[in-house]
Amino acid sequence: AEEEMSVFSAESRVEDVARALLFAPYGRLLFPVQSGYMDGDTLGSLRLTWYSHISPARTVAVVNRLAADAAAGHRIFYPIYTEEEMRRDPAKRDTGLFFFRGLTGAPVAVVSAGGGFAYVGAMQDSFPHALVLSERGVNAFALIYRPRAQTECEDLSRAVAFLHEHAAELGVDMRGYSLWGGSAGARMAAWVGSHGTEAFGQRSYPRPAAVIMQYTGLSEVYGTEPPTYSCVGTADGIASWQTMQRRTQAIRRNGQAAEIEV
């Protein structure tokens, strides 16, 4: 009955959400497919490795938003690789884009969660962002990728290519699109933003209008950065705010717009 009503709660079991018919056959990708990085049996008790301050209310809101869209007949997930590509490389079956719809014809944000290049922490680090962006009219896509720096950038580049090629079908405008990410996801956004999709196996597509980065100690500056916004906390034990501040200053010295919020 819970699924038929398209309503989940903090007491809903993670296993039941992942197997819900509304999300079939991609519900498993709502949560880490790599073992050992998730604790908790319910949406309310869900915890992800390296993250704190996860909001059960936001987790429930994310799941219910996707469920409501699916119940209304909207497609909520798009594979980024063809069936033949996934057959040749089964790991590519664990990739794709969850679509949080904004306004028809509005710009696009692609949001990539962190996870230490080991797993995808989407329920903490990309789904909540995509939900809020969509509520503000932006068409937000949360990327599920293959962890590891190279494959992450390949998957993000493929996602950008997919969105450009299917923009009309999706009802989105790729002009002025942005790349968002936290932790490892922020590095993905920065690398693809700076080097372009052509550096990671795709043909050249327009660079993003902006890169939005959260809490990652990336220091490299190549002189090809898009306008960049960064934010980080002073008490972050993993990402150095000083490193992020120095990078922001270096981007500015190259004549590009860059801001940081500490």
Model-identified regions with their sequence ranges:
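N-terminal targeting or regulatory segments adjacent to alpha/beta-hydrolase or S9 domains
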Residues: 1-93
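A short loop-to-beta-strand scaffold at the N-terminal edge of the catalytic core in hydrolase folds
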Residues: 88-101, 107-108
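Short beta-strand element of the alpha/beta-hydrolase
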Residues: 106-115
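Short amphipathic alpha-helix adjacent to the substrate-entry channel of hydrolases
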Residues: 122-141
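Primarily recognizes the serine-hydrolase "nucleophile elbow" in alpha/beta-hydrolase
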Residues: 154, 158-225
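Short alpha-helix in the alpha/beta-hydrolase fold that links the catalytic acid
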Residues: 226, 240-250
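Short beta-strand/loop motif that positions the catalytic acidic residue
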Residues: 229-232, 236
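Catalytic histidine neighborhood in serine/cysteine hydrolases
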Residues: 252-262
